[in-house]
Design a protein with these regions (language model features):
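FAD-dinucleotide binding site
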Residues: 1-313
C-alpha cells in the first residue's frame, strides 16, 4: 500500500526472469534451472518435518542429515545461497534448521521503486521534526522521563521509542543509564546479525540482455557473487548489482573497493566475454562496518527462537 501510494510507480520483480551461467560461462538450459524451486522446497519441507526445537541444529547440518551429498551438488548449493541465504542474511552453517524461515512476509509481490525507496518515506516524514546529523550517544531514563544526549545537544521528553538497529545495540555504541535489563541484553547478544554485500556497477552501455531481471552464476565459493540484479530492466540506467551472501560478505568487505570491483568484473567477463567493459562507477556496500547498522539484517541462528525476537519489542 505504501509503495502504491508513493509518487513513483512500483515495478514488480519476477524471480523466474532469470538466466544462470555455470562457472565456465555457459548458459544453463531451463530444464536444469526450472526444477530447482521444487527441489529446494522439497528438501526444506523434509527438514521442517524432521527438525524441531528439541533437536535444533544448523541448516547445513540438517541438510546433510536428510540428504547426504546435497551440499556437494553445485546447483542445490547455488539455490541455497541465492535464495535462502539471501532471504535470511545468514549462512546455512549458522541458520537454525528449526526456525530459519519463521519470519512473516508482507502480502503482495516484491517490487522495486526505480526512483528510490525514499519515495515511501517522504510522505511518512511530512510534518515531522526530524533532526539529521544528531548521533545518539546516551539515553538516560527514569520514572520522570528521558534525556537523550547526541553529538549536537541534548533532548528531554516523557518517553522515547528506540529503533536502533540490532547491530548497533550489539556493539553497545549507545550508552543506556541505567543499563537495559539483563534479559534484554542477553537476547541482543543471542540473536546474530547477518550481512548481504552489494556492488553496484554503472556502465556506459548494457552488454547484457536488458530484459532479463536476474543473472545467476555458479561460483566456486558459496556466496561469492552468485546473483546479479539487472537494474536496466527497471530504469533507464546501465547498472548491474552483484550480490554476495552467507559467510562471504564478512570476508570480502575487508578488502579495498578496487579489489572487489576486479573480482566482480572477472565473473562478468566469464559470463559475457570481452563485451563486459570497465564500469564508469562502482559502489560497494559495507553494512558490517556501517556505524549506523553493523550488519544488514538479523537472522534466526541455532539456539534462537522466534520468541527471542518478540521479546526485543
Amino acid at each position: 500500500e505504501l509503495a502504491a501510494a508513493s509518487a513513483t510507480m512500483p515495478l514488480v520483480t519476477d524471480d523466474d526472469n532469470l538466466v544462470v551461467y555455470d562457472r565456465n560461462g555457459n548458459i544453463l538450459p531451463d530444464e536444469i534451472i526450472d526444477p530447482l524451486d521444487k527441489i529446494l522446497e522439497s528438501l526444506l519441507d523434509e527438514i521442517d518435518e524432521w527438525v524441531d526445537a528439541e533437536n535444533d541444529r544448523s541448516l547445513a547440518s540438517a541438510i546433510d542429515a536428510v540428504n547426504t551429498g546435497a551440499l556437494n551438488d553445485e546447483l542445490i548449493l547455488w539455490a541455497l545461497t541465492t535464495f535462502t541465504e539471501f532471504d535470511t542474511g545468514g549462512a546455512i552453517e549458522e541458520l537454525s534448521a528449526a526456525y530459519f524461515n519463521a519470519d512473516s512476509a508482507f502480502r503482495g509481490a516484491d517490487v522495486i521503486l526505480p526512483a528510490g525507496f525514499d519515495a515511501i518515506l517522504e510522505p511518512l516524514a511530512a510534518n515531522l521534526d526530524i533532526r539529521l546529523g544528531h548521533v545518539v550517544e546516551k539515553i538516560s531514563y527514569d520514572n520522570s522521563g528521558i534525556q537523550i544526549t547526541t553529538s549536537r545537544g541534548e533532548f528531554a521528553g516523557n518517553f522515547a521509542v528506540v529503533t536502533l538497529p540490532l547491530g548497533v545495540l550489539k556493539q553497545q555504541v549507545v550508552a543506556f543509564d541505567p543499563e537495559l535489563p539483563t534479559s534484554f541484553r542477553n537476547r541482543v547478544a543471542k540473536i546474530p546479525m547477518g550481512n548481504v554485500t552489494k556492488v553496484a556497477l554503472k556502465f556506459d552501455e548494457a552488454f547484457w540482455d536488458p530484459a532479463v531481471q536476474y543473472f545467476g552464476y555458479l561460483s566456486e565459493i558459496k556466496g561469492k557473487w552468485p546473483y546479479f540484479l539487472n537494474y536496466r530492466a527497471f530504469a533507464d540506467a546501465n547498472i548491474l548489482v552483484a550480490l554476495s551472501f552467507g559467510a562471504y560478505p564478512a570476508e570480502v568487505e575487508r578488502r579495498p573497493d578496487a579489489e572487489i570491483r576486479a573480482e566482480v568484473m572477472d565473473i562478468l567477463r566469464t559470463m559475457f566475454g570481452a563485451n563486459a567493459t570497465e564500469p564508469l562507477q562502482c559502489l560497494v556496500t559495507r553494512w558490517s562496518a556501517d556505524p549506523y547498522a553493523y550488519g544488514a539484517y538479523s537472522f534466526t541462528g541455532t539456539g534462537v527462537e522466534p520468541e527471542d525476537f518478540d521479546n526485543l519489542a
